[in-house]
From Swiss-Prot:
One of its GO terms (molecular function) is phosphotransferase activity, alcohol group as acceptor. The gene is hldE. This is Bifunctional protein HldE. It comes from Rhodopseudomonas palustris (strain BisB5). It is an enzyme of class 2 (transferase). Keywords: ATP-binding, Carbohydrate metabolism, Kinase, Multifunctional enzyme, Nucleotide-binding, Nucleotidyltransferase, Transferase. Residues 358-490 are annotated as: Cytidylyltransferase. Residues 1-330 are annotated as: Ribokinase. It comes from the Bacteria.
Length: 490
């Protein structure tokens, strides 16, 4: 078992108490192709829309998605947006919501209008009251929070300055948590870090850090110097400054700064990436990891989150694929077990703008001819899926004496190759059904076929894809190898 798997097992046993500003995130996707005749403003032709639990609610969703349990305390209004949020959170089996309703304020709601094609935000509309909660609501929040501290392994305060985390709530929660020996992570919004006094870790982004410290924060040394004064003011153990494409820097009260560069990734949407960082930091630290491990996990999770549209969560499988070197992934990670899993991987790759390739075969006894085709196929794409004939399919095509190796053994051999990203077993005589599902950008076969003989060529061509024929190596075929083995010749 890898260290990552051991960490995931520990995460599954942790509970995070998350408190913060809950909001409803709505995304309206469309395109602009004309200007309104009524006023000089663009007209968005809406194509689709979606809703997500946002703000501190997205932090809670990320905590649950990575495998931990989350007790979540937030504030909603007595309105449709609040009821929608309650229903959405109730669907999350690993989140225990304790929502306080304040009829005097609306539920925070943000509607973003986004270009479907370019993934750029064109407009945002907000419904909110950012004033602090009343003393009555403060008390109801504390009545919900304080009894849960004993159950939590770590506390996470997600401050969006929408009224939940008042100074009274912050001070009361941190003091109570410290008495119980619980660590507190704060994702701050206030430029006055002193109100978070006693927290274990503050996680401002660069803009928030500059505003609070009045420093340039252009280098690790700049951040380290300014953070020491800020930590003294906030009486915290460490400060982590996130810097988007420049990575993240952790400055401990005692010890050397740790900087983790950002992972290269095609950014589609940065909405909620900070939520993901805070959530992963909390669960990994609660699971017993050190600062450096927690930072690497958070950085990898952020890279996954920004490659998705909307307010996104990160799963353990996505985190594993981002953290572990490609060649280190276990064979079972590359062998697809269901159509739903295949669809999930494809969606993930396409969100990242990756070119997907496909080839297929029986691969009964892997030989240099196979390796040449697979290597060429991988060179023509960013991710290669290999369609593998099932045992029953091979018998129909090759006869009752085949395959020599069963489908699981053949799949594991293929999955061990660095050129192969996924192996999908199909039971039909041809991979046509699989190709229709994948719709690859490039379809690869050996040069002993003509373009018209390649199954699925018309599907790929219709989508503007490429059919690639690779010259075969003479003298290599599984059939001839089997015959030679039976004859005892080489």
């Amino acid at each position: 078992m890898s260290r990552f798997d051991t960490l995931l097992q520990s995460i599954a046993r942790t509970t995070v108490l998350c408190v913060g500003d809950l909001m409803l995130d709505e995304f309206v996707y469309g395109e602009v192709s004309r200007i309104s005749p009524e006023a000089p403003t663009p007209v968005i032709a809406v194509q689709r829309s979606e809703i997500n639990v946002g703000g501190a609610g997205n932090v809670a969703r990320n905590i649950a998605a990575i495998g931990a349990r989350c007790i979540f305390v937030g504030l909603i209004g007595d309105d449709e947006a609040g009821r929608t949020l309650s229903a959405e959170i109730a669907r999350e089996s690993r989140i225990e919501p304790l929502l306080v309703c304040d009829p005097a304020r609306p539920t925070t709601r943000k509607v973003r209008f986004v270009s479907e094609h370019f993934s750029t935000h064109m407009l945002r509309a907000d419904w909110e009251t950012a004033s602090a909660a009343s003393s009555e609501i403060e008390q109801r929040l504390l009545d919900a929070i304080l009894p849960q501290l004993q159950r939590a392994d770590i506390v996470l305060l997600s401050d969006y300055a929408k009224g939940v985390l008042t100074e009274r709530v912050i001070v009361s929660v941190i003091e109570a948590a410290r008495k119980l020996g619980k660590r507190v992570i704060v994702d701050p919004k206030s430029a006055n870090f002193a109100i978070y006094r006693g927290a274990t870790l503050l996680t401002p982004n660069r803009k928030e850090f500059v505003s609070a410290t009045r420093s340039a924060a252009e280098t690790v040394d700049d951040i380290a110097a300014a953070a020491q004064d800020a930590m003294a003011l906030a009486d915290c153990e460490a400060m982590l400054v996130t810097q988007s494409e420049h990575g993240m820097t952790l400055v401990p009260r005692v010890g050397e700064p740790i900087h983790v560069p950002a992972m290269p990734v095609k950014v589609r949407d940065v909405s909620g990436a900070g939520d993901t960082v805070a959530a992963v930091l909390a669960v990994v630290l609660a699971a017993g990891a050190d600062w450096a491990t927690a930072m690497r996990a958070a950085s990898a999770a952020a890279a996954v989150a920004v490659s998705k549209n909307g307010t996104a969560v990160v799963t353990p499988a996505e985190l594993r694929r981002k953290i572990l070197p490609h060649a280190s992934l276990a064979a079972e990670e590359k062998i697809i077990g269901s159509e739903a899993e295949l669809d999930l991987r494809l969606a993930e790759w396409r969100r990242e703008g990756l070119r997907v390739g496909f080839t297929n075969g029986c691969f009964d006894i892997l030989h240099p001819g196979h390796v040449k085709v697979l290597t060429a196929a991988r060179g023509a794409c960013d991710r290669l899926i290999v369609g593998l004939n099932s045992d029953a399919s091979v018998r129909r095509l090759k006869g009752e004496s085949r395959p020599v190796q069963n489908e699981r053994a053949r799949a594991e051999v293929l999955a061990a190759l660095e050129a192969v990203d996924l192996v999908a077993i199909f039971g039909e005589d041809t991979p046509l059904k699989l190709i229709k599902r994948i719709v690859p950008s490039v379809l690869v076969k050996g040069g002993d076929y003509t373009r018209e003989q390649v199954v699925g060529h018309e599907i790929v061509a219709a989508r503007g894809g490429e059919v690639l024929l690779v010259d075969v190596l003479p003298g290599f075929s599984t059939t001839s190898l089997v015959e030679k083995a039976r004859e005892g010749t080489t």
